[in-house]
Amino acid sequence: MKVMIIGSTHAGTAAAREILTRHPETAVTIYERNDNVAFVSSGIYLYLTGIIRHLEDMFYTSPADLKQLGAQIKTHHNVLRIDTAHKTVQVANMQTGEVFDDTYDKLIMATGSSVVVPPIMGIDHEKVLLCKNYAQAEQLYQSLQANQRVAIVGAGYMGTELAESYASMDQQVMLFHSHSHILNNYLGPKMADAAIKLLQHHQVDVHLNERVTGFTSGSNDQLVVETAQGDYEVDLAVVCAGFIPNTELLRGQVAMDRHGAILINDYVQTSDPDIYAAGDACVVNYNPCLLYTSPSPRD
């Protein structure tokens, strides 16, 4: 059995470890575009607050660990195309430029997600950061040393956690959210209000129903955050506008929802029985938090 895993995310490496532990005779190949594997971005806030002391501890495993289990891991390799009809993939070696084909019996799509970059004027400003990967986590950590006033744009999980992290490090934090309550995809208004009170108790300035429309340079090397309600001068802004699944390789070949997340059954199989999906690339079939956001899941 030849299993191919695209993406060495937490989900991809966990799948490789499980397969090789239970079925060591399986030939497992992992293709990864980056030079590192299994970075757990959801724990970035733990690094910023010092609970995790070393950024390297945010890696779920290492290429050496996977090789020891028997996996063939190819970093700096970008999968260009998947042909599900013939069970082949086209891969580019990003260091040499070589392009080649490979085959699989079973494929696991663990390509994760990418940060949503909203169309905000000035979002490419040097004082505006994103939050997802290893390099961005290091930038955020360095920013703690030099900045006192920080604007967080977006109050989903990541934005809310970052607001708490920066506030705990004695930074002045403003949290902007275009919705009427924070964590609106996960919590109902009552629980969200309780979370807001906790943030405010830690001196986080929460701005609800306030959409950021632009970033410009201000006086004294400041960054100006522009909204319809007013302008705010800060030292740094971090945009946490959500994530989109990296599933373009399978678009039109397996069933997806309207956001591009791959639909799976209870065994994480896609509509193609030889292709599985895990992590941010696929839907979540059971989310108990939805019970608190809407009555519809209970109907």
Task: Give the positions of each predicted feature.
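Beta1-alpha1 glycine-rich phosphate/pyrophosphate-binding loop at the start
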Residues: 1-72, 163-187
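Residues that mark the start of a beta-strand
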Residues: 2, 27, 140, 148-149
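Catalytic nucleophile loop
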Residues: 12, 156-159
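A Rossmann-like FAD-binding core segment of flavoenzymes
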Residues: 25, 70-95, 102, 169-265
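Glycine/Thr-rich phosphate-binding loops of Rossmann-like dinucleotide-binding domains
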Residues: 117-118, 160-161, 184, 247-248, ...
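FAD-site-proximal beta/loop scaffold in flavoenzymes
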Residues: 124-147, 231-294
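A short, hydrophobic C-terminal helix/tail in secreted or cell-surface proteins
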Residues: 295-299
